[in-house]
Amino acid sequence: MKTIFAVTLLLFAIYVPECMPCHQSGCSPGFCCWLTYPPTTATDPYSCVSNSTLGVSCGPCGCLQGYNCTSNGGCQLLRRVG
């Protein structure tokens, strides 16, 4: 059962790469999901990092700056108009 769950998480991470799956569980205010290298776990290469971390700029709802939330709890790149 654990194997099926892990594979499902891995596939989910591949198909929604921006802020998932750590964004799904949420980060505290002032923190956002950030791709860590090397990955902390095989199924979740993202971790919650502070907005004050060098090079990290968190936007609303735990997404990185320049991204907005999607209905499935992930993040997507903002489309610039003009």
UniProtKB/Swiss-Prot annotation:
Specify whether Zinc is a keyword of the entry.
Answer: no
- Gene Ontology cellular-component annotations: extracellular region
Per the record, the major location class is: secreted
Protein origin, superkingdom: Eukaryota
A molecular function (GO) term: ion channel regulator activity
Tell me where it resides. Secreted
Tissue-specificity statement: Expressed by the venom gland.
Cysteine pairings via disulfide bonds: 22-33, 27-48, 32-61, 58-69, 63-75
What keywords appear on the UniProt entry?
Disulfide bond, Ion channel impairing toxin, Secreted, Signal, Toxin
Q: Which residues form the signal peptide?
A: 1-21
The keyword Disulfide bond is annotated on this UniProt entry: yes
What this chain does, per the entry, is described as: Probable ion channel inhibitor.
Tell me the protein's name: U17-hexatoxin-Hi1a
